[in-house]
């Protein structure tokens, strides 16, 4: 069976991780993340909590991959985006 090549990325404010992996056709997002080794390298990644996407489009761990996809592991939000916008608007008024 032919292989597909995908990238798996995880970004922190101080460091970015990019791993290219070769997988069999029909592999899933979860397969790529496990093959990348990022789960062992970054114990803070919890696939039950962290959302994932392909090229900024949210996907599920069981979704199939295509050759050339970029799997992105997203960090949980620390603050509520609405609250941050409200605070910035108040700051701008001053």
UniProtKB/Swiss-Prot annotation:
Say which family it is in.
Belongs to the UPF0125 (RnfH) family.
Q: Which NCBIfam families match?
A: PRK01777.1
Protein name per Swiss-Prot or TrEMBL: Protein RnfH
Q: What is the lineage of its organism?
A: Bacteria, Pseudomonadati, Pseudomonadota, Gammaproteobacteria, Enterobacterales
């Amino acid at each position: 069976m032919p292989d597909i090549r995908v990238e798996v990325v995880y970004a922190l404010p101080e460091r970015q991780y990019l791993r290219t992996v070769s997988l069999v056709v029909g592999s899933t997002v979860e397969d790529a993340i496990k093959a990348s080794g990022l789960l062992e390298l970054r114990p803070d990644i919890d696939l039950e909590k962290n959302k994932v996407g392909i090229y900024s489009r949210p996907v599920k761990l069981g979704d199939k991959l295509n050759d050339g996809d970029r799997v992105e592991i997203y960090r949980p939000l620390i603050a509520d985006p609405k609250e941050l916008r409200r605070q910035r608007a108040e700051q701008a008024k001053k």
